Amino acid sequence: MDPKVIIKNPTFDSSDNNPDLIKVKNVDFFYKGNKRALFNISMKIKEHTVTAFIGSSGSGKSTLLRLFNRMNDVEPKSIFKGEILINGKNIYSPETDIVKLRTDIGMVFQKPSPFPMSIYDNVAYGPRNQGVRDRKLVNSIVVENLKRAALWDEVKDNLRDSAFALSGGQQQRLCIARAIAMKPKILLMDEPTSALDPISTSKIEELITQLKKDFTIVLVTHHMQQAARVADYTAFFAKGKLIEYNKTKIIFSRPANKKTEDYITGRFE
């Protein structure tokens, strides 16, 4: 990268009109009481955008992602400090309903994880669990979300087949359909294409771009090109610290921090 084009201190570009949905304030996180994974993280994530977290393994990006739906609560002797506000409410307050929080915040994991049941029942599972009993309504939910996940045309004649009969890419889109069937406000994606072939990856990326119209998406990825293709905003993490956060086009064309520049140009792992 030509150092002449680098602006050393660009201000955070929040020129779009989307309101802030997630606010992270001075967050520290420790595993097992003494292994510090995050150092004083503060950032805001805008509604109906795709925000990518990039950085090498162990940089803290997945740890922060999992704090958004409190998945790290299960870690023994973990310590959380700071605040995470979603729609203005501190999700780490004692009054937080964890079940509702995880309904409002869907999660798609690195490895496709369909339930051991039919394609249809995978998507119907969540709504049924929330009390939806009307068969026509369940049918409409299944069809709608398989279409939104760009999977309907491939499975419409085989809805009663096992989800495990699908390819890896199809399974991941099924997991996305299952997640969005719960009508979450936020969709978290932790390396959703790392186990997929290039064609399946392309389909997931197209889907991410479409889904931000209805959801706020936070994506962890090791692939910088993927962040450049799909993300509106990108945050670069290193050793538990947020090094730089801005619009993706700024991060990739004129990063303010030398560490960011080194990472995106391949000089830093």
Swiss-Prot record:
Gene3D superfamilies: P-loop containing nucleotide triphosphate hydrolases. The keyword Membrane applies. CDD domains: ABC_PstB_phosphate_transporter. Its main location: membrane. It is found in: Cell membrane. Residues 22-264 form the ABC transporter domain. One of its GO terms (cellular component) is plasma membrane. ATP binds at G55, S56, S57, G58, S59, G60, K61, S62. GO terms for biological process: phosphate ion transmembrane transport. Its EC number is 7.3.2.1. It comes from the Bacteria. It catalyses: phosphate(out) + ATP + H2O = ADP + 2 phosphate(in) + H(+). Belongs to the ABC transporter superfamily. Phosphate importer (TC 3.A.1.7) family. The complex is composed of two ATP-binding proteins (PstB), two transmembrane proteins (PstC and PstA) and a solute-binding protein (PstS). Part of the ABC transporter complex PstSACB involved in phosphate import. Responsible for energy coupling to the transport system. This is Phosphate import ATP-binding protein PstB. It comes from Spiroplasma kunkelii. The gene is pstB.
